[in-house]
Amino acid sequence: IAKLCDSDLVIDLTVEGLMHARETAAILKSGARIMTISNEHPGILSRLRPDPAMKEIVRSAVAACRAATRMKVTSPAGTDLTVAMTDIPTVGVWGWTDRPGTLAHWPGGLVVSFPRQASCNGSIVFAPGDINLTFKRYFESAVRCVIRDDFITEISGDGADAQLMKRYLDGFNDPLAFATSHVGWGL
């Protein structure tokens, strides 16, 4: 960790290794920048090169989230989720790190907010063709997740995708596996 803290730039090629590690805060506090290269196929990375225009797009989205009191997410598939947004941390990633003590990942272009406890309620419906990033595959059948006070309380669906998601989360044997950590979207 001391060597990482002494560096100007740390390139992270692990699968979400430093992004969620306890040591990250110390590395960033030292002034080092962490650039995470997402676990994607090289063909995807070659198509998603950093775009200088993305920085301002992300900053505008962050400003909109910080000014919002409520986020309402709906979809034709049936998603209907409400998130309280007042005075919560929101960050954006545009695909590169250009300031000391910051972490970014490539590909970038997203905004993420960290809601207060018991502030996410409703349902999220994953439709066939949506991407399940955890399993790096497309949903083949609809999956509905009911969220009450930040926790998934029900997972339903007719196909294997619902069972796969439920068994995966159950496998942690930890109620926090069903909790909302953050909300956001890609830009």
PLM region spans:
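Active-site bordering "gate/hinge" segments
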Residues: 1-144, 148, 163, 174, ...
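Dual-mode signal for accessory low-complexity, basic/Gly-rich regions
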Residues: 138, 154-187
